[in-house]
Design a protein with these regions (language model features):
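Residue-level recognition of well-ordered beta-strand positions that form the cores
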Residues: 40, 64-68, 117-121
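Short, charged interaction patches at domain edges and termini
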Residues: 1-10, 44-52, 56-60, 96-130
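Short C-terminal domain-edge/linker segments immediately following a structured domain
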Residues: 55, 67-75, 94-100
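Small/polar-rich, solvent-exposed N-terminal microdomains that initiate assembly or binding
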Residues: 1-52, 73, 80
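Short secondary-structure junctions
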Residues: 14-20, 89-96
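Intrinsically disordered, low-complexity segments enriched in small/polar residues
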Residues: 32-34, 66, 110-112, 116
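Mid-chain, well-packed structural core segment of small domains
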Residues: 64-90
Length: 130
């Protein structure tokens, strides 16, 4: 059994950020509006030790979220979005934030780009461990 909570998490973030930012999955090269948030899962592997005749009990899951903002308040806007996202993924769901950093946006340096990665072990009942 594959445990996959990425659609659920994306839907929750979409609802949370609805009036504040455009959120997309997958990334668009030229978004029409800012702030712009992308969501992608980068890991969904079985935990081998948890497999028995009933199937896999635990899955390693990872998400990457990128925040793009523009304008005079771009840094503040990105940090506000980061806080909301972190409260949802770390606070509410229990995922471990493994990366949280500003990344240069090579295509357009007027765009502030911030990357956050979360990881966790999810059981067959969708409970998160880290």
């Amino acid at each position: 059994m594959i445990v996959d909570v990425s659609n659920q998490i994306f839907s929750e973030l979409f609802t949370l950020l609805d009036r504040m930012a455009t959120i997309s999955r997958p990334n668009q090269d030229n978004p029409l509006e800012y702030p712009y948030v992308t969501f992608d899962d980068f890991d969904n592997g079985d935990i081998a030790d948890s497999k028995d005749t009933g199937g896999v009990k635990y899955t390693s899951i990872g998400f990457e979220i990128q925040i793009y903002t523009k304008g005079d308040t771009r840094m503040t806007d990105a940090k506000e979005l980061r806080l909301l996202i972190d409260e949802k993924l770390s606070g509410e769901h229990g995922f471990l934030r493994t990366t949280s950093q500003k990344i240069p946006n090579l295509r357009d340096d007027s765009i502030y780009r911030y990357v956050i990665r979360y990881e966790g072990i999810v059981d067959e009942n969708e409970k998160v461990y880290n």
